[in-house]
Amino acid sequence: MSRARDAGCVAAGIVIGASAWYCVYKYTRGKDQKKKRLTKPKNRASVGTGSRARAGLRAGFTIDLGPGFSPPNPVDIEIMNKAQGEASNLATTVAEEVAPAAPSPKVQNGAESKVQELNGAKTEANLESVVMPSATCTVTPPPKVAGGLTAAEAPEIIGAPKVLEAPSTTEASGAVAAPGPTVSPMIAQTPGPVVPSPTIVSTGPAAIPWAVAHPGAVQSPGPAVPPMAVQSLVPAAPSWAVVAPPGAVYIPVAAHFAGPAAASRVTQSPGTVIPPLPPPSSVLPRGVPSVPGRTVQSPGAAVHPVAAQSTGVVVPPRAVQYSGAAVTSGGAAVPSGGAATPRAAASTQRTASTEVMQVPRVAAATEATETPRIGTPAMVAEASLPVHSGAAENPGTSGSSKTAATGKKAAPGAHTGAIPKAGSATGAVPKGGGGKGGNKNRSGGKGKNRKNKVDVDELGMGFRPGDGAAAAAAASANGGQAFLAEIPESEEGESGWTDTESDSDSEPDVPQRGKGKRTIPMHKRPFPYEIDEILGVRDLRKVLALLQKSDDPFIQQVALLTLSNNANYSCNQETIRKLGGLPIIANMINKTDPHIKEKALMAMNNLSENYENQGRLQVYMNKVMDDIMASNLNSAVQVVGLKFLTNMTITNDYQHLLVNSIANFFRLLSQGGGKIKVEILKILSNFAENPDMLKKLLGTQVPSSFSSLYNSYVESEILINALTLFEIIFDNLRAEVFNYREFNKGSLFYLCTTSGVCVKKIRALANHHDLLVKVKVIKLVNKF
């Protein structure tokens, strides 16, 4: 405990003194330097023989590793590049004067003095690039090689190649072993039993191509703890120059060659410059065994003395990486964006527990040798460049561009962004089904073209063949009213009917699972059945084709009713005409079935509201009049037929076609019911407004019961229409001079004169209870 306390005091004094010296030195020397504009960091690394490797910094990227870690400080890329270039030149110059063996403390001090004399002003850049407040131990290998960073180096070193420039960030190569007892910051481990090195963990944002132990670094105790900070060195130092910050201990990485390590030990003073000689690539054997290096550790992390890990160490599940990549130790790249699986094979004696982080594009040694290890499983993400695990790698495998990546096994659409095919999980609804009831059509089945107990005819309309005969039989037993099965409204968009063809060839028919066949309950009610949906062009064409092809009365009635309801809209009136539906519908009045005739007349009545359609339907006016007279009195055919003729006689263009039917209208007027009377009075009023038809109308012999229409007990609707007819005729009689001799007695002319019977009855209606009738009567009386 006393040794640890003394060592801590000494370390604290060194840190305080070095900090004061550094502040004074920076203040005195910093005035002469000019500020340079920072260049934009490049996010690439170029590697070549004799050229410096440059790597960009992803600035502004921070990762929260917990309350015990602080965010990395920003790194000046320009200063670091300048420092590395100067360190490279300095290493080449000083290497000629330094022996290959590890120098003594005096030699190192002399080298430091020489370097300071040669580059006094340039040392500040090196110190700024080395001293990082939050990075206590950073290790970065040369670029694009999957070599082990802490692999042991050979004692023989020939030549001094150019120094590689360190990237701006540090990469954590593996997991850190479980924490153990801490040691004084300046105490390094003595060479003991050789153990495979665990991984190198760094919390700082920048890395330099040497290992620097910060005064605050905590390491686990080795076999022996010397009182001073001593580190064993191999005969040849690594292939780069080191400018240690004040109070830092130089911990070189072991050589890549096999051989006995030098027993010389060097204690470094603050600011010492180490000019080692790098080994040439020609001397590096491929298959030599590797000597494990020592552990370099960041502050706050303690390593167990016996914790040893191989190159197959896998990043723990909680590892946070800058590039989002977890890479195997053998240089295998893993997919980006994924997390390493906790079940990855790793030959370790202790389980790593400390969180680590990874920085993209970390360079590796150019001639690293590897030992066979188990790679990371294929469930982790792929990285752009290989990462090192801290131990030697497979012989003969280098981290060049030929480095093989482990295959990944991703779920479909998980990482690739591929959209899965349309199915039940995608939410795509096929055209044959709706939202509320699933993909059920009118037949009660699942999806299109499905059948259940309710058979579907060959045209796919969802009606049972042969129901027409049953409907006719039911009609005869029900007083002429046919009972038809209620068909539920469709949920298939515009059509309102089951689609027998796919709207689009590209839409797959997705069957719905887990739903059995269900029979739609058949609720019966009399016609007419109203469908509120407005059909489109395609659906109207389908209904017209169905009406033309089917011989089933049931289907014909429903199709005509559908067309009739849709013909109420002006847009569909034109659409049906353009589709050639007018003759198809009009030909249905030739059917002997009164229900089919009625539905056809209803459709024709709605279609006749369009003037262009009237030109196509005028040829059917006499046929409709014949059907009216041949039908039962007060039947639906008569009422609907008269409504059709009312629309056709609104204009004067086609009234002459019914000039021979005026007497029949008066006969129906005297015999028919209220609806018949109303429609006939409207037709006669249209005739009265046409001067060409007025003379024919006035000369018609009318029944004596015609004057009874102006009695007070008559329904108000009938009475109002009768008063309207009389007003039109009376106005025309006052406007024109008619010869009385041209009209016979009993004609309409004599009934409408001022001395006629109708005028007397109209005067008696002045006290009628209906206000509209009373107003109408007063208006007429003022004209008498």
From Swiss-Prot:
Residues 396-418 have a biased composition (Low complexity). It is a single-pass membrane protein. It holds the Pfam family Arm_2. Residues 328-353, 388-461, 488-522 are annotated as: Disordered. Residues 488-508 have a biased composition (Acidic residues). Keywords: Membrane, Mitochondrion, Mitochondrion outer membrane, Repeat, Signal-anchor, Transmembrane, Transmembrane helix. Coiled coil: none annotated. Residues 1-6 are mitochondrial intermembrane. Widely expressed in the adult nervous tissue, especially in the forebrain, including the cerebral cortex, hippocampus and thalamus. Residues 1-6, 26-40 are annotated as: Mitochondrion outer membrane (MOM)-targeting sequence. Signal peptide: none annotated. ARM repeats lie at residues 528-568, 570-609, 650-689. It is found in: Mitochondrion; Mitochondrion outer membrane. Residues 28-784 are cytoplasmic. One of its GO terms (cellular component) is mitochondrial outer membrane. The chain crosses the membrane at residues 7-27. InterPro entries: ARM-like, ARM-rpt_dom, ARM-type_fold, Armadillo, Armcx_regulator. SUPFAM superfamilies: ARM repeat. Belongs to the eutherian X-chromosome-specific Armcx family. May regulate the dynamics and distribution of mitochondria in neural cells. This is Armadillo repeat-containing X-linked protein 2. It comes from Mus musculus.
